[in-house]
């Protein structure tokens, strides 16, 4: 029911007829419940636009919402925040995607000065202080870029087309669905034809590659023979390929050696110092010329950043990362800041070539900048590394923490506790703990189901409304 206010006493409906006493009373009550103005209307508060809801963006948002009176707009192409260190568990069916993610709109509903805008950044206009998204334009007083990095295929379009990345929740679900489809299809084939569909090649010897190889090996040992008895004659192999001479290159030598021994114990084939050269969907070719026949290449071999339209080439440093000063603002734009993987800060004496592209760094930078923009600190940003850890398999992991090198059960327990406590909400922590307990005691994964929407479902739904 629409109303037209003609003076302080009389209200008319859309047909210009006076409202009844009941209608007028109801209209007054509804009007009293509405805000005097929309938060998108003119506002004298400083407007901070924050692009990216990853570790850096969320930590920065928490501090800004807590300490500042600024008006904040959070921009992300996805309407959820997720916990990247556990996406490999989603790809293996140990966890549901909802166990490690949380809706952004529900998250920001606790903050009166924060609004969410879904969209992908297309360009920045530093002169006019505006950004262009695929969903429209937004003006800003301060801009924070924390949009993270993308999977790095090192310019190889063939790899980008055929390899399976593991960077996002969508990637993890694609891997899960792909592998289940491969297992099911292989079960219908003669034994001699199954190998390429069951063999898995993982590119990248960092934590993501090692943890994925470990969990896939665990599925082979504890699950596959029960769920796919027809595949007992040939369950395929797992090969981990890395360009480095060791696994977990940033970690201690003792952790590297222990990881290598455990991988070999789990019957994971290891290939060192021989990066992937090409992959056509059927055959992996390494730099040495060695070939591996597989339909399953999972890519965890690094990340890269993209150039942002509107910024100049001198704004970028090595790896297409934005050059920032000691307060994380762009060298040439003091009203634009960068955080996380996309930021390159060279002022820190301990990291003269820039901080590593890690979640720890992103979280630390986000917390710092939120406090800095809220006036809670004026010191320069300095990063203190807390340590590294990696899960290898059931009851075994490695951890380098404050000079101590843990391995085996102790490292595994530390890894489990730290990762559970790092999840966003109590619901995430409880769900993850429960699903891990079920998998641990029963040897079964609850989410080994291939559930995919029809590829044209959204298109058909949209067209039906036209």
Please describe what each predicted stretch is.
Residues 345-384, 389:
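A conserved FAD-binding loop/helix module that cradles the flavin
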Residues 4-11, 16, 26, 30-45, ...:
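FAD-binding core/adjacent interface of flavoenzyme oxidoreductases
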């Amino acid at each position: 029911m629409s109303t037209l206010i003609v003076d302080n006493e009389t209200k008319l409906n859309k047909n210009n007829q006076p409202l009844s006493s009941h209608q007028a009373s109801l209209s007054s009550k509804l009007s009293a419940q509405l805000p005097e103005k929309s938060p998108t209307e003119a506002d004298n508060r400083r407007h901070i636009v924050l692009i990216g809801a990853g570790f850096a963006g969320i930590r920065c948002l928490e501090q800004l919402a807590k300490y500042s009176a600024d008006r904040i707009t959070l921009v992300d192409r996805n309407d959820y925040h997720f916990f990247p260190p556990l996406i490999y568990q989603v790809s293996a069916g140990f966890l549901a995607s909802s166990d490690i993610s949380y809706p952004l709109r529900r998250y920001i509903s606790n903050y009166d000065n924060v609004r969410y805008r879904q969209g992908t950044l297309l360009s920045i206009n530093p002169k006019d202080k505006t950004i262009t998204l695929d969903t429209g334009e937004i003006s800003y007083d301060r801009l924070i870029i924390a949009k993270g990095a993308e999977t790095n295929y090192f310019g190889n379009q063939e790899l980008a087309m055929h390899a399976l990345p593991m960077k996002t929740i969508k990637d993890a679900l694609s891997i899960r669905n792909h592998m289940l489809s491969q297992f099911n299809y292989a079960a219908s084939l003669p034994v001699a034809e199954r190998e390429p569909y069951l063999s898995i090649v993982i590119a990248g010897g960092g934590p993501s590659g090692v943890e994925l190889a470990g969990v896939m090996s665990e599925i082979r040992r504890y699950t596959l023979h029960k769920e796919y008895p027809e595949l007992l004659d040939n369950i395929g192999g797992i090969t981990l390929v890395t360009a480095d001479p060791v696994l977990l290159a940033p970690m201690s030598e003792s952790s590297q050696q222990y990881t290598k021994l455990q991988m070999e114990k789990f019957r994971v084939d290891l290939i060192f110092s021989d990066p992937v050269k090409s992959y056509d969907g059927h055959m992996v070719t390494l730099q040495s010329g060695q070939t591996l026949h597989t339909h399953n290449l999972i890519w965890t071999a690094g990340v890269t950043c993209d150039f942002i339209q509107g910024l100049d080439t001198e704004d970028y440093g090595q790896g297409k990362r934005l050059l920032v000063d000691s307060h994380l603002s762009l060298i040439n734009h003091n009203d634009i800041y960068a955080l996380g993987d996309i930021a390159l800060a060279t002022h820190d004496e301990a990291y003269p070539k820039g901080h590593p592209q890690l979640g720890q760094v992103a979280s630390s930078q986000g917390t710092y900048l939120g406090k800095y923009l809220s006036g809670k600190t004026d010191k320069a940003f300095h990063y203190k590394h807390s340590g590294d850890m990696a899960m290898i398999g059931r009851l075994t992991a490695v951890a380098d923490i404050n000079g101590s090198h843990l391995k085996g059960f102790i490292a595994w327990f530390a890894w489990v506790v730290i990762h559970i406590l790092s999840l966003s909400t109590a619901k995430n922590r409880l769900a993850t703990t429960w699903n891990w307990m079920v998998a641990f005691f029963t040897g079964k994964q609850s989410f080994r189901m291939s559930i995919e929407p029809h590829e044209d479902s959204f298109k058909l739904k949209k067209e039906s409304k036209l």
